[in-house]
Amino acid sequence: MLWFKNLMVYRLSREISLRAEEMEKQLASMAFTPCGSQDMAKMGWVPPMGSHSDALTHVANGQIVICARKEEKILPSPVIKQALEAKIAKLEAEQARKLKKTEKDSLKDEVLHSLLPRAFSRFSQTMMWIDTVNGLIMVDCASAKKAEDTLALLRKSLGSLPVVPLSMANPIELTLTEWVRSGSAAQGFQLLDEAELKSLLEDGGVIRAKKQDLTSEEITNHIEAGKVVTKLALDWQQRIQFVMCDDGSLKRLKFCDELRDQNEDIDREDFAQRFDADFILMTGELAALIQNLIEGLGGEAQR
């Protein structure tokens, strides 16, 4: 279903036109098509509502959700190595000589081309939420690389996409460290029982605390010894729990049952109406959380 699990947050660095009607046509030019026999990977747009709609965008209250699909061919290294060694051995026996490195490299390409049509495919989907009201773009993934790949596809589709990772005026890890040291987070937030602390020294250690009182003397001693908090589990207004990371990303989002059940009165058979209602609910909550978080972390860095 729609509920995002992670958030990589980006700021639009200047205003651009993001009208859904126009975007629908632009995304259609980069719609997903499966890998051909010689493609290692393909990426493109699919309807965020899956088989329930052909639209590549879903819009509500100035919020747009889109979905990218990626197909990757799986060719394990041992399979390539085995096929290549067999081909090299066969040719060396036929020609009664050792093959040069350039010849072996050329053979590797041949082997890849011969194996590709028979390779299995791995599919993945990444949802992206565009907040045109606040000038933010959120990608539902846990890695910056995956987020950047999805943003690159959108940039190619639109022709231009001036975005930068959302960054704070003060280093996030120092703010998180102060929250743990004082035992109190910013207004609206509550410390949970999980954190990661890292030494500022290059060869320093990493401490991962789970199901632990973060106000305990043990954690305080690590901070006094020079470690900083790089990940911190937080609760926001008893509505959403998440792990705040020092790169500005939010991981392992967990919406409270009361929130998720808010649209239970909608007939489950009416997928489109439920999708729309959940999208409005989720984006409204997350937009408020992000704004609250920016304020709590000391404000955004000047652009």
Curated annotation (Swiss-Prot):
GO CC: one term?
A: bacterial nucleoid
Name the major location. cytoplasm
Q: Which GO terms describe its molecular function?
A: double-stranded DNA binding
Identify the Pfam families for this entry: RdgC
Q: Does the keyword Translocase apply?
A: no
Per the entry, what this protein does is:
May be involved in recombination.
What PANTHER family does UniProt report for this protein, alphabetically?
Answer: RECOMBINATION-ASSOCIATED PROTEIN RDGC
Q: What name does the UniProt record give this protein?
A: Recombination-associated protein RdgC
Q: Tell me which species this is from.
A: Escherichia coli O157:H7
